[in-house]
UniProtKB/Swiss-Prot annotation:
Keyword terms of this UniProt record: Cobalamin biosynthesis, Glutamine amidotransferase
Molecular function terms from GO: ABC-type vitamin B12 transporter activity; catalytic activity
Pathway stated in the Swiss-Prot or TrEMBL entry: Cofactor biosynthesis; adenosylcobalamin biosynthesis
Organism name: Methanococcus maripaludis (strain C6 / ATCC BAA-1332)
Active site, renumbered: C330, H436
Gene that encodes it: cobQ
Listed PROSITE patterns: GATASE_COBBQ
Domain of life assignment: Archaea
Protein name: Probable cobyric acid synthase
Amino acid sequence: MAKFIMVVGTSSNSGKTVLVSGICRMLSNKGYKVAPFKSQNMSLNSRVSIEDGEIAVAQYTQAMAARAEPSIHFNPILLKPKGNFVSQVIVHGIPYEDRDYNEYRSKKDVLLEKIKESIEYLDKNYDYVVIEGAGSCCEINLLKDDIANLRIAEISGADAILVSDIDRGGVFAAIYGTVKLLPENWRKLLKGFVINKFRGNLDVLKDGFEKIEELTNIPVIGTIPYDETLILPEEDSQALEGKRVFGNVKSPIEVNIVKFSKIANFTDVDPLSSDCLMKYIDFNDDITGDILILPGTRCSTVEMDLMKKHGMDKKIMEFVENGGIVLGICGGYQTLGKILIDENFSEGDVGTISGLGLFDMETTFGNKKAIKNSTGTISIFDQNFDVMGYELHEGHSISNETPLISLSRGFGNCGDSYDGSFKVIGDSYIFGTYFHGILENFEFRNYLVNIVNNKKNLSRIENDNYAEIFNENMDKLSKLIEENLDLSKIIK
């Protein structure tokens, strides 16, 4: 049987995801078989499990931290917002139905049974299960129907840790208010408090620690210092609010990413950040980079409509005429074609719309969703290299362009053994693919960046450091947690 530990928060972005990742890596480093778990997650950032099911990217990342093969049981319920208060409900990796909140709430008991199935599976197959809660664990207007927080600790028998972000201010009020608003049966599950993102001298918190323990009879088990050097994947698009420039700010190569209104899987661009200056651009902005990325999106037709309304379509065409490099991923790839056909308005209110026309390609929506871990080979001029990625798309594309990838596994454009498209227009290179994670393949990533290096007479790069950087940061996070938290009463 597994030992269950749960991390809940006083608010969203309190540090739950990071703390779970760090505990998973710490336990893995000690030789335990560890699984992360989040019963219900809401995110447009998702990846594909070993069963070819869809799970939130946060649980996929936590699985990597735990050195575990990502499973649908790590995130049995995934909600993907579609707009108008409706979300696509993913159950055990497979699209279940589209529901608004009231409809979803009516299915609570059915979904809770699915969650229990996953808890039973994890209990039988792992030494430790580290559970992440969602948002605040004490939204009193939602407690009756909450299947993502302390109800899960109660079901699994988990010891719970409450984490709060001191960087926001009011940390002790947040902790006290949360504890006092919780029902007694859930309050007693809390075994300790964690203060996250502290800067300064710990001595100034001593009186606060003593008072909060006196008031709640629950100890503060640690304080995690704010560490700006940690490089960790972001969980969802909230992280992009106010984020514009990141990556290697000294790099002579600039990458622009169009900030789609319903951007999805934006972490696809992260592998470029060690070598390039990265910049999100809005629909009204000019394109100033050497490489332009059209990322994934939940609604390709909506983004195409917005690009036209704001003149971004014309800016992209001018960028191509001037020799720019374009990479479209999934929804971004679809916008590069001649037409996006959505007769049933499955993508939103726009319906069928003409695309950028950079590829001789048409995409049709309303199909069964392709959810695949995929592999194949890229052959560009005299270059040949194997790549892997994952597919999450309902659009099927028929392209008359040169395929980017010959598939050995996957669905690709329309189940025809090929994925993506590739085209050279003058000095401009246009790439498109359904492969999320394409830039995690160092040979393709280096090929893309070296096109710019060659144009600018810069030194070529031959880096293969993305996975290494991830593991270094996870080990650093693990050490930070082990040095600053007393988990001895919880981890036995």
